[in-house]
Amino acid sequence: MARADKATAVADIAEQFKEATATLITEYRGLTVANLAELRRSLSGAATYSVAKNTLVKRAASEAGIEGLDELFAGPTAIAFVTGEPVDAAKAIKTFAKEHKALVIKGGYMDGRALSVAEVERIADLESREVLLAKLAGAMKGNLAKAAGLFNAPASQVARLAAALQEKKAAEGPAEAPQPATEPPAEAPEAPADAE
């Protein structure tokens, strides 16, 4: 590869690093071209899957300000530059790796830090953003309905009590005017028993 071509390739890869929301790094030793094409299709717009020379990728990562990945760039390395949801891309790669043992997840990079294999797999095990938002909305809707019921309950209870009291008074008939209370006569104080 000519020096100018290498510089262009490094600039292109660096730009992909900068634009990606996450990168997932894999080893593809033993996969066929057909397997790689199948993996690219399974990513379906969530990421672009690229194979490049490790030296060029290291330089591009350095230019993009990404650190901590150099040890992952050994052997036949391919990178998924995630532009959509990291969960979707990680899930697709993990599923493909289960079906094709030749694909090995080496790690990744997201939110300014390197990811271990375990962290990439945990991301893959998460539910997608849409599912999580739907669950949150469902939980909020249920809680709002309960809150509305709680706020309406006291008012309806007071209304039922008022109606019951009104019916009871109507059944008793007209009430007599209250009589003024009479005070009992004051008692005379007792004389002391010692007086003689």
From Swiss-Prot:
Superkingdom of origin organism: Bacteria
Annotated Gene3D superfamilies: 3.30.70.1730, 6.10.250.290
Keywords in alphabetical order: Ribonucleoprotein, Ribosomal protein, RNA-binding, rRNA-binding
Keyword Hydrolase: no
GO biological process, one term: translation
Family matches, as PROSITE patterns: RIBOSOMAL_L10
CDD domains tied to this protein: Ribosomal_L10
Listed Pfam families: Ribosomal_L10
Keyword Ribonucleoprotein: yes
Region (Disordered): 167-196
Subunit annotation: Part of the ribosomal stalk of the 50S ribosomal subunit. The N-terminus interacts with L11 and the large rRNA to form the base of the stalk. The C-terminus forms an elongated spine to which L12 dimers bind in a sequential fashion forming a multimeric L10(L12)X complex.
Family: Belongs to the universal ribosomal protein uL10 family.
Stated role: Forms part of the ribosomal stalk, playing a central role in the interaction of the ribosome with GTP-bound translation factors.
Protein name, as recorded: Large ribosomal subunit protein uL10
Organism of provenance: Mycolicibacterium paratuberculosis (strain ATCC BAA-968 / K-10)
